[in-house]
């Protein structure tokens, strides 16, 4: 379990003989400057920036229960997914958090095709897949894209 080196409190024996599950394909962002470079070259896509840390239980819940939902995955295919891993809480991590006035993870910031943050679309704390689909619908509406249906 966790005492044997498992890092996920929801799956303390993960990796102990079972294949690892597929993870959401986030591009890691390590600094504010790197984020600006990526946003400038995002080719008109909506961008999602997920603030994550290994010690953040709600972050693990988002990965396990929300991001893994096929309906969420379908919406992710239409976005550029970025992740700022602030586990180390170093100067670059703190600068990124401060830039978006976040105290820590979990926090998700969305940017429109123009590279600017989409006002009123931040997700702070855990959201179930159902609630997150509603949040993604708001993001798409603000970005001028077709609305997302929450129900299958």
Task: Annotate each PLM feature.
Residues 1-80, 84-152:
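Proteins that catalyze or organize thiol-disulfide redox chemistry
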């Amino acid at each position: 379990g966790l005492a044997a080196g498992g890092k996920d409190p929801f799956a303390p024996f993960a990796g102990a003989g079972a294949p690892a599950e597929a993870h959401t394909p986030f591009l890691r962002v390590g600094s504010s400057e790197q984020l600006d470079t990526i946003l400038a070259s995002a080719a008109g896509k909506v961008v999602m920036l997920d603030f994550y840390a290994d010690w953040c239980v709600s972050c693990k819940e988002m990965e396990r229960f929300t991001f893994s939902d096929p309906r969420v995955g379908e919406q992710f295919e239409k976005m550029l997914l970025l992740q700022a891993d602030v586990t180390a809480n170093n100067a670059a991590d703190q600068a990124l958090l401060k830039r978006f006035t976040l105290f820590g993870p979990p926090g998700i910031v969305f940017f429109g095709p123009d590279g600017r943050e989409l006002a009123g679309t931040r997700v702070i704390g855990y959201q179930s897949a159902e609630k997150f689909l509603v949040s993604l619908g708001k993001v798409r509406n603000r970005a001028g894209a077709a609305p997302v249906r929450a129900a299958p």
